[in-house]
Amino acid sequence: MATSDIQVKELEKRASGQAFELILGPRSKEAAPEFPLSPPKKKDLSLEEIQKKLEAAEERRKSHEAEVLKQLAEKREHEKEVLQKAIEENNNFSKMAEEKLTHKMEANKENREAQMAAKLERLREKDKHIEEVRKNKEGKDPGEAETN
């Protein structure tokens, strides 16, 4: 488009800016349009070309299906690994808890046995003391009877 086909008309001028109006001249018949008005006509496809396109589409479909199946298999494998790891961690936790409980029970048993042994020792000491007091008392009783 030539510059002589364009007219610039100033509409108003303000502090905020200016406004213009562009007036375009009529199109010349010599200028070719920049884009075609209608899409180019498609050529008629032969049976072989159609068959090739169908086969290519089938290959793409099969390839896509294989990719999806591969992704599903990988996902299932990952799920199996995660599940196996969770089971293993659970077993380890159970084993550790059982060992801890067994150790605690053994410690409690040893503590209880030690307390029982200490009580028995105190009872023996008391019995021994009582026996000594009895012997001392029996030894003193005949003498006390004479003095009364």
Curated annotation (Swiss-Prot):
SUPFAM superfamilies reported in the protein's UniProt record: Stathmin
Positions of region (Disordered): 122-148
Domain SLD span(s) in chain numbering: 4-145
InterPro entries referenced in this protein's UniProt entry, alphabetically: Stathmin_CS, Stathmin_fam, Stathmin_sf
A GO cellular-component term linked to this record: microtubule
Subunit architecture: Binds to two alpha/beta-tubulin heterodimers.
Protein name: Stathmin
Organism: Gallus gallus (Chicken)
